[in-house]
Amino acid sequence: MSSNFEPLLTDLIPGASHWSMVIPKGHTLRLKDVEGGANLSVLFYNPKNLLERYNAPDTLKCQHTFKLTTGNCLYSDMGRVFASIVRDDTGWIDTVTGVANKKKVADKWGDRDYQHERNHWKQNGYDALLVEVAKYGLGQRDIAANLNLFTKVSTDIEGMMHYTPEHSKAGDIIELRIEMDTLVVFTTCPHPMNPATDYPYKPVEVSVAKAAPMQEDDVCLNSRPENRRGFENNRRYHFTADLLTH
């Protein structure tokens, strides 16, 4: 957790919106649920090689978990750590249920109509991510399985998935320590399993600050032996990159 968090940048992502930024390694990304009940769908890419992106199966498999929370790392498909979860007030981050598409949102909340609703339209998470990644030359084939921050989806003994309404409370914070230069892509569109009667517009505040150097007793480094190997992959990647730039 960042005890002396001094933001270099702060922004507010309105509900039903999308946002992205390349965040350099050595920074902490703080995400705050402003009103409670937010959902923040997230994708990660290597801005220097956009073919490298967040890999959900490897992230879960190597850490032997279905959920993510404080102490977990977020892996690329090259076995490197994009980010470490150093704070999670919610205790559970959804990893498997993805985003809603146009039909899902229309069936649940009605057709979107930008002509009349403008920026208060009923956008869906899939199209929102597509719009944002297109800014970097990416498209449909580049939309991988995403995370849903501030959202909890659990399973029962028979394997049925259950959405927890209002899992995140107003003011809840999740902090990600960025371990390599990372393109972060967000959308605040509602979760596909959200049972709300009316389309929920829930904003999320984003802040970026310098991160303290990782110590040997770091919770993310030590939560799984596999994470040590992930950080070693990062070290070798940055070692090679530094050689090539000198």
Task: Please place each PLM-identified region on the residue numbering.
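Intrinsically disordered, low-complexity segments enriched in small/polar residues
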Residues: 1-246
